[in-house]
A protein has these predicted regions:
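Feature recognizes metal-dependent phosphohydrolase scaffolds
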Residues: 1-189
């Protein structure tokens, strides 16, 4: 965890992580994990703590499950989560908007004026079609978007939208979208 924080700090101007940490303040996200087996929670917890949580969860109420998950999260990844709270909700370049979940595209060039932080971290609908900038997001599983449960790569609509949430917990692969500023083209690495 410390090595990751040091690396991210060193390369902060090159590597941008668009924060979705607001969702960690209200732990409901833990109980509605799209992969059905707490994949997000598992990614933050040690194997011992994840096993401890799954052994207890059936005996706990929803609120108690959340409290226990948060307790374990803070114990295992508290420093990382605290650091993530300081990250921006979006990052904008001349050509792209990078965001955790999505934006209110109906606002056009005024999208920022009409997009709430809740939408930036919790949007669950897929946007398709042309937009004046490319929108690069995660949050929604590319397996779900593509309709292929085994798909774990980057999904694009061929216009202005790229989704990166590629079930890393299963594949062991982190989808990376590379942009070539000279050609204006993207490629998956």
């Amino acid at each position: 965890e410390k090595a990751l924080l040091d690396w991210l700090e060193e390369y902060a101007d090159i590597n941008r992580h668009i924060c979705g940490v607001e969702q960690y303040r209200d732990a409901e996200w833990l109980l509605s994990d799209a992969d059905g087996d707490y994949g997000t929670l598992r990614s933050f917890l040690s194997a011992r703590h994840f096993r401890e949580f799954t052994e207890k969860e059936a005996r706990l109420s929803g609120d108690s499950q959340n409290a226990e998950a948060v307790r374990l999260l803070l114990e295992d990844a508290g420093e990382l989560l605290a650091w993530m709270r300081h990250l921006p909700y979006y990052y904008e370049t001349e050509r792209q908007i990078l965001v955790h979940a999505g934006i209110a595209e109906w606002g056009g060039e005024d999208w920022l004026c009409v997009t709430s932080e809740a939408l930036m971290v919790g949007k669950t609908t897929v946007s398709r079609g042309n937009f004046y900038k490319d929108v690069i997001a995660g949050h929604i599983s590319t397996a779900k978007i593509s309709g292929d449960r085994t798909y774990d790569g980057i999904w694009s609509d061929g216009s202005s939208h790229y989704y990166l949430d590629g079930t890393t917990w299963r594949s062991g692969k982190i989808p990376v979208l590379e942009y070539d500023a000279e050609t204006g083209r993207y490629r998956e690495r």
